[in-house]
Amino acid sequence: MSATLVIVDMQKAMDDPRYGKRGQPDAEEKVAALLGHWRELGNPVVHIRDNSLDPESPYAPGRPTHAFKPEVAPLDHEIIVDKQTNNAFIGTDLMQVLEDIGSIELVICGVHMQYCVESTVRMAGNLGFMVFVPQDCVVAVDQTDRTGRHWTAEEVHALQLSILEGSFCKVLNSEDLISANGSETLQ
């Protein structure tokens, strides 16, 4: 079975200014290319949609920003898993979906690196999946820590990927995934 592409929270809400300055300005384009390749090969795709319980959140159902970004929107036959936490496995049927597909390898991309992507990657790794993260297909935003230090989106992106790599996932570029995905395994 080919790897399953899991796209996390690629909704219009990701552009809301309340999340701060974002990095990876080409991420949507890169995810769209990866998604197009997955579709051409007939490989499984799962879209994760944030259904925030906070009615003021741009991710709240019913708000215009709750919609998927058009360039990575799911096709009618593609699976959508709705979540209400920062981890796509908690309180959802994602594990059952992946078991039904027969997935052992996951390619996880989306937003935001330091929140939902990180939580989902960690959980997937802990559950025994072989996880791949295309570094050019995940978006981080600026972060200020409790001491008041400001971290740019680029710094957050690099730090988060370095923390996850090895213990929870393999980090690579989307071009590497596109060229490798025709094989039986990505390893």
How should each PLM-predicted stretch be described?
Residues 3-7, 11-12:
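Extracytoplasmic cell-surface/polysaccharide-interacting catalytic and binding patches
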Residues 2-4, 32-36, 40-41, 58-187:
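Active-site-adjacent betaalpha module
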Residues 18-25, 56-59, 148-150:
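Short glycine-enriched, charge-decorated loop/helix-capping segments at active-site entrances
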Residues 7, 44-50, 134:
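Short beta-strand segments at enzyme active-site cores
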Residues 19-47:
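A short alpha/beta connector and helix-capping loop motif
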